[in-house]
Amino acid sequence: MAEVSAYKDTLNLLQTPFNMRANAPVREPEIQQFWADRQIYETLSRQNPGAPFVLHDGPPYANGALHMGHALNKTLKDIINKYQLLQGRKVRYVPGWDCHGLPIELKVLQELSSEERRNLTPLTLRQKAKAYALAQVEQQSQSFQRYGVWADWDAPYLTLTPEYEAAQIDVFGQMVLKGYIYRGLKPVHWSPSSRTALAEAELEYPDGHTSRSIYVAMPIVQLSEAAQPLLGNYANLALAIWTTTPWTIPANLAVAVNGELTYAVVQAGDCHLIVAAELAESLSKTFATELTVLATFPGSVLEHSRYRHPLYDRESPVVIGGDYITTESGTGLVHTAPGHGQDDFIVGNRYGLEVFCPVDDKGDFTAAVGDRLVGKNVLKDANAAVIEWLTEVGALLKEESYAHRYPYDWRTKKPTIFRATEQWFASVEGFREQALQAIAEVDWIPAQGENRITSMVSERSDWCISRQRTWGVPIPVFYDEESGEALLNAETIAHVRAIVAERGSDAWWELDVADLLPEPYRSNGRRYRKGTDTMDVWFDSGSSWAAVASQREGLHYPADLYLEGSDQHRGWFQSSLLTSVACNGHAPYRRVLTHGFALDEKGRKMSKSLGNVVDPAIVINGGKDQKQEPPYGADVLRLWVSSVDYSSDVPIGKNILKQMADVYRKIRNTARFLLGNLHDFDPAKDALPWEKLPELDRYLLHRLREVILEIQDAFESFQFFRFFQTVQNFCVVDLSNFYLDIGKDRLYISAPDSLRRRSCQTVLAICVEALATAIAPVLSHMAEDIWQSLPYPARTKSVFQAGWVQLQDDWNQPELAAKWQQLRDLRSEVNKVLEQARRDQAIGSSLEAKLQLWVADSDWRAALADRNPADSLSGTAVDDLRYLFLVSQVELRDQPTGLTEAKYHAQTEDWAIAVVDAEGQKCDRCWNYSTTVGQSSEHPDLCDRCVSALQGTF
């Protein structure tokens, strides 16, 4: 409007360098450089006055680009650490990387030609693996830093460094000396594709696995004394077993029954079969033949009966198994091969059965199975060969496909088997009760995590810690060349540990046995060879409490917090717990927090084949097509992390990111408005004391106090989604839609130094500093950007040096808040009627309206009258109803009569509202309508408020 321009320069308009657009790809790295140049994290982590806070980092694997799970995990950690720093605690966060293991070894091997692989020595492989791991660490570190994560990036812990490896050997040594480490032949998860034993954590169970399951008759040759009177009259009596691994039949050494179940003799043609009574009917359908129940009896009577193996000339016993024998599937009788199953091994051990394992490391049958099967691979042609043989001898009752969960090697994506091998184990049985007690003393978030890990530790078998690979920490054992006896004691372990601490674990491959042995063993008349096994990588990372938390300056053990994905209940949480309990009798952590996995917006797992992968690097920096994949910056990603309930799996995708960017912009624009209205304000000179503030300002400080306490509680309880909701609600509902909406009038049109403007600026300054501080743990870059844009001298160089928001007791005004909440509720009703008039184009701006109002409660009516002075220049010029409702005039009525006759109205039994045209003319400066426009000869187009403002009195 042309006439406005005459007075435009007299308005107090927004002035701030704080940009509406974040320009995150440029601005965020600049802010990160600001932190680095001034060593903000380093200074706070060492000089804060509070107690140390240790969040011990679970090491990601040093292989491949970071994915959304990494971003979720590291950002959660950073939010917690930054909040603790703002609370004045010393927070040294040492990031770590898991650097050994098969995936890195395979990566190195894939890059070699067949000629290079043939000539590859263990040391060369290890050198290449180390170089690869270090390169991956550097790449991942740069990505983590781009997320805005603060850490000791220049001094991370790597499981391949000499000091770490030495500490790990220390842990192993302590467990040896306490009798928890032993060597034994035992079935372990074995990967023929990797030719190594695997830990539980290295298995995955993909959908869609189908096995060839078979039912086999095992002919009884001798009944036990208890079974003879019951079953002695049945000819051709056989045990019906079921298995999903036909290749294990040659290794069968027993059939197990459940002593608590009822079994039946059923007639099937001219044969009598023993099955679980409960399954007789379903097995009739499976075998497609009538199974007539002739007798029933308890399973316990079968113990010590004997049967003949269907393929070999050997007899084996019927044994009592455990509660793993059920009637959910199969026949209720379990084929038992102690060399090929955990339960089989335990039962076989109880009955003194041989641990028979006729399968080599490639998965091929050995000569122990006879000429017909030798050399066949158990995952390829062995099943068919065994089934063919069983069919020939008439022992096969039925074959059918069976879909079930089956363990695969997590790296090669190929099936595994159970295979008994000579391995090194940690005897969990030796300290299981201590471990369960330690679990109970930890605070688990969410609480169901405790049940999960308790169940896992209760039921787990001993931990196979040896691997037949080159890239890892060696198990420091020597073997007598003649007897094969292991040499592993305090002296030998300490000697190897000292060498590794100085030279790294390469020394195990570089040095001769004589150099690795302590002096007394070099010439004791025996010849030794060094072991070739390395430790399970879970033993590597599971020793980090010893190598890092208990050794690094500024850290402590037990750590205050471990925070990882929920899969780590069977991974790092558990391996760390077991090593710590074995060595020291307690958990390595006081509190454990777990989060779910990042899924797409439809709740599906991310995969390249589905094309639904959300790459954090693209979220931050943008993709090739920046319209389709805009550069949102790290803060939008961090805001997403704060918005989700991470206790379960969390979705992310384009729509969710757009929503986050929208919320981010709202917060940013709120901050910009606050900053822009402080351009001529210096709190040291211009701020008003609390008691001089109008009611509205005191009410807003009450709300600010509530908001900060809610945010603080959200951070303390790790419920970051409450932070997200509270900040968003405060910026949009309390500030933008209410306080700032009302405040524009006094900020823009008042005299610069007037009470009504300075009082508002006092609150804006408090709010903008509080907002910057409160969002800093999450929106770290925006918070710093706000702080650097403060138009007056800031208290500190960085927002993070300012400490947490300091709340004043005076701000707590519950009675005042109740009064203003009532006014806000009424304002919402008024806005509905104004909006109706606006939709009909009866008014453009609400300032074109006059509000007519009646309330039923006489006390409230009187209170409202106090807020509605007849003269614009009297009253507080802040708390008046016209400013609250953003109208030019308010007329209070003693009766509702006539209000409903207005075209735009609303009514309840408690109040009545009508909107009519404002009286007077429009002021060219403030756009309010007033009957005083034209009264000033000097400023004939202005109202009395604006004339006074130009004179410096309003």
Curated annotation (Swiss-Prot):
Domain of life: Bacteria
Residues at which Zn(2+) binds: C923, C926, C943, C946
Enzymatic class: ligase
Renumbered ranges of motif 'KMSKS' region: 605-609
Binding site for L-isoleucyl-5'-AMP: E564
Cofactor: how and how many bound: Binds 1 zinc ion per subunit.
Similarity remark: Belongs to the class-I aminoacyl-tRNA synthetase family. IleS type 1 subfamily.
Record protein name field: Isoleucine--tRNA ligase
Species the sequence originates in: Synechococcus sp. (strain ATCC 27144 / PCC 6301 / SAUG 1402/1) (Anacystis nidulans)
